[in-house]
Design a protein with these regions (language model features):
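Conserved small/polar residues in nucleotide/adenosyl-binding loops
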Residues: 179
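OB-fold ssDNA-binding interfaces and closely related basic DNA-contact patches used
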Residues: 1-145
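Short acidic, glycine/tyrosine-flanked loop/strand segments centered on an H-E-D-like triad
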Residues: 134-171
């Protein structure tokens, strides 16, 4: 089989692994809340029902999809080969991603990064929607959940940004040396 060379190859997204949820704040606007266990969401009810049997929790509808707040903070997963990890500073608005940078270069405008260079100042402005947030994405396979596809874990946290990339590199290196 010969792939089309100018199209990115990928597995279908089966669902999302979430570490937070939104709760109503004092002003009526939604406020993010960190969870102690994982929350899984998918467009396919059967995947969420299977996950609930494995990891506990009750299946419910959520924004046109299905979700389960699991009862576990550990989920067995596999990292498929290829580009399954990405990190950017990103700023989103109602119209989509407005900035995507690496801390120096902003790729959507092909210009310099517009955010402050100092992390604490950037974090403060990001909390107000005025600067980019670190955005770390990792695609994994949940081998015990039926179906083919990846589950995307996305984090905007500092520790995910500084630790996950090193963990993925370590796992890939160990795999190349047949340690895993």
């Amino acid at each position: 089989m010969t792939p089309i060379l100018d199209l990115q190859q990928r597995l279908v997204e089966a669902g999302r692994i979430r570490t937070g949820a939104s709760t109503p704040g004092q002003s009526g606007r939604k406020v993010p809340k960190k969870l102690e266990t994982f929350r899984l969401t998918s467009r396919e009810r059967g995947r969420i029902e299977a996950a609930a049997k494995l990891f506990g929790g009750t299946v419910q509808q959520w924004e046109g999809q299905w979700e389960v707040y699991t009862e576990t903070n550990e989920i067995p997963c596999l990292i498929p080969p290829g580009a399954q990890f990405s990190q950017w500073y990103e700023l989103w608005s109602g119209g989509g991603c407005t900035r995507r940078c690496d801390g120096h270069h902003e790729y959507l405008s092909d210009g310099p990064c517009l955010c402050p260079g100092e992390y604490d100042e950037k974090r403060e402005l990001a909390s107000k929607g005025k600067a980019c947030k670190p955005t770390t994405r990792l695609n994994v396979i949940l081998p015990d959940v039926p179906g083919i596809g990846v589950w995307r874990l996305e984090s905007h946290g500092y520790y995910a940004a500084v630790e996950l990339s090193t963990m993925v590199k370590l796992i890939e290196q160990a795999d190349r040396k047949s340690v895993v």
